């Protein structure tokens, strides 16, 4: 993952980070699937009905990053595949997590 890839989907915001996401609901399982148009693509097993996909996304991000769910907030795109999520975690920790996810991604 290049620095420009990292800058495109992850930036510092106050005491945390902003993460740009491209979400694909109704997948077989919840997992990261590389970068897509400057955002981390996440496949979600949940359907996009009654906020279930957003709830699954928040739970997956919180568990993956080791933060409470209350520290993950969907700021933009609640009803869209493109989302902007604020996470109360250090930029270094988020960048290391993202690098680990994308290490083998194309």
Locate predicted features.
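Contiguous, often N-terminal, cationic amphipathic patches that form binding interfaces
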Residues: 1-59, 63-69, 73-79, 84-106
């Amino acid at each position: 993952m290049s620095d420009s890839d990292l800058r495109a989907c992850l930036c510092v915001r106050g005491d945390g980070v902003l993460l740009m996401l491209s979400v694909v609901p109704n997948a077989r399982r919840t997992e990261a699937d590389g970068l897509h148009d400057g955002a981390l693509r996440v496949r979600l097993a949940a359907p996009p009905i009654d906020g279930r996909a957003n709830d699954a996304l928040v739970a997956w991000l919180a568990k993956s990053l080791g933060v409470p769910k209350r520290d993950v907030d969907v700021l933009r795109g609640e009803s869209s595949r493109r989302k902007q999520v604020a996470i109360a975690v250090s930029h270094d920790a988020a960048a290391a997590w993202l690098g680990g996810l994308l290490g083998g991604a194309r």
